[in-house]
Amino acid sequence: MKLLILTCLVAVALARPKQPIKHQGLPQGVLNENLLRFFVAPFPEVFGKEKVNELSTDIGSESTEDQAMEDIKQMEAESISSSEEIVPISVEQKHIQKEDVPSERYLGYLEQLLRLKKYNVPQLEIVPNLAEEQLHSMKEGIHAQQKEPMIGVNQELAYFYPQLFRQFYQLDAYPSGAWYYVPLGTQYPDAPSFSDIPNPIGSENSGKTTMPLW
């Protein structure tokens, strides 16, 4: 019914063109009242004051509802756009965190490998060279001492093998710390040869002594 009345009023207004109402700077309530007066003035017997007030309130409520709906739509659009922006950011953060975890592990492995390369590899390269030198010196000693007793050769072997095994044992026992290694240049004291042991001193007549018979 109200819509029918409003359509009739609009048709009447279009049929009677007048000068436009200057409503710049006026509030919404004043504009609604002016519009109602403009439409209702030609039909005072149809619309009373109560009808005019009801129509004005209805128009005001409809305008406020329209504004509220527009505001809600704008808020929903903003929330959707903000959620779309937040989701890629969270996905990128998760991807970065997943990449950081293995990178830390690989860094730890690389540090360990660098330590092993720094401390172990030079010593592992030195040990075979030292062994070759000692073998060469041992062979020369064997050729030089062919006419001498085998005591000197046995002493050379007794000095060579414990020293070589001791160095390899140290490398296996402490793989990641250079301060545990005994310097390779250290020389252990040679064992005294049997020829250097002083002979016991005794009297020449010790072999001719006679034991008394009881």
UniProtKB/Swiss-Prot annotation:
Keywords, sorted A to Z: Milk protein, Phosphoprotein, Repeat, Secreted, Signal
Residues carrying Phosphoserine: 63, 79, 81-83, 90
Tissue expression remark: Mammary gland specific. Secreted in milk.
Pfam family, one: Casein
Gene Ontology CC: one annotated term: extracellular space
Spans of repeat Sequence: 85-99, 125-140
Coiled-coil portions: none
Segment forming the signal sequence: 1-15
Main location: secreted
Location of the protein in the cell: Secreted
Keyword Repeat: yes
Example of a GO biological process term: response to progesterone
Superkingdom, taxonomy of origin: Eukaryota
Family: Belongs to the alpha-casein family.
Family annotation (PANTHER family): ALPHA-S1-CASEIN
Designated name of the protein: Alpha-S1-casein
Organism: Bubalus bubalis
